[in-house]
Amino acid sequence: MSKEVSVEGEQPPVKDYTDPPPEPLLNFGELRLWSFYRALIAEFVATLLFLYVTIATVIGHKEQNAADQCSGVGLLGIAWAFGGMIFILVYCTAGISGGHINPAVTLGLFLARKVSLIRALLYMVAQCLGAIVGVGIVKGIMKHQYNSLGGGANVVAAGYSKGTALGAEIIGTFVLVYTVFSATDPKRSARDSHVPVLAPLPIGFAVFMVHLATIPITGTGINPARSLGAAVIYNQDKPWDDHWILWVGPFVGALAAAAYHQYILRAAAIKALGSFRSNPSN
């Protein structure tokens, strides 16, 4: 009888999890691995495809409006293009490079010691080069429309101050990077084995939602590679005048999201001091 009671009272086993060890600041061993260069290629190609599809969508929308045709995809469609492409590309590249596709995401993961400094820097280079090539392809395919319709470049819209634009970029990037941390949290993955498969969905949806809020202000940066690619290929004064906002804002937002997730939600600083024991039911 006691045996039956003890069996009935047993709880289903809880999946254990362990945080991966922090990446070393300088991991030169990565430079000898083919998987490292494969990841760089994946980031380059993913960012190229991201910029090609999204900037082509922006230019197509503006062309239809300028020609007094139907309104095209509209701002909602543009937001879906950005969010949908992130969903697709993160799904395709997460197992190869982590699916960053954004220097701000890479910075946030570096600050959380998820990637080494060498990997972070070279990822950013690959992302920026991919963005430039992707926008260049758009210009090559639709040169007249590209040059006459703003080139998909991020600028501070009329009626908004640079301070407002900076704040919008900080908050928008915070939402994105915070979502990345939450969707890829190893503790969440340990509880539910299907979470890693679904991780691209909330990340893409976060990009979609942030675009809805920020397109009227800056055209939505939250990705310095996206902003740089369009600015380099369009190469006009206004995008360059506002360009610093599209680096400072996303990087500050990424830093804030990394600090919030690691030191508030995960209590990393307190755990390191040995004065806090996390509740396994959390």
UniProtKB/Swiss-Prot annotation:
What family classification does the UniProt entry report for this protein?
Belongs to the MIP/aquaporin (TC 1.A.8) family. PIP (TC 1.A.8.11) subfamily.
Tissue expression as described in the entry: Expressed in roots, leaves and fruits.
Transmembrane stretches in the record are 39-59, 72-92, 121-141, 163-183, 197-217, 245-265
Q: Which residues lie on this side of the membrane: Extracellular?
A: 60-71, 142-162, 218-244
Gene responsible for this protein? PIP2-7
Which source organism does the UniProt entry give?
Musa acuminata
Q: Which UniProt keywords apply?
A: Abscisic acid signaling pathway, Cell membrane, Membrane, Stress response, Transmembrane, Transmembrane helix, Transport
Motif NPA 1 location, chain numbering: 102-104
Tell me the protein's name. Answer: Aquaporin PIP2-7
Q: What induces it?
A: Slightly induced by salt (NaCl). Accumulates in response to osmotic (mannitol) and cold treatments.
Q: Which InterPro entries does the UniProt entry name for this protein?
A: Aquaporin-like, Aquaporin_transptr, MIP, MIP_CS
- What is the recorded membrane topology of this protein? Multi-pass membrane protein
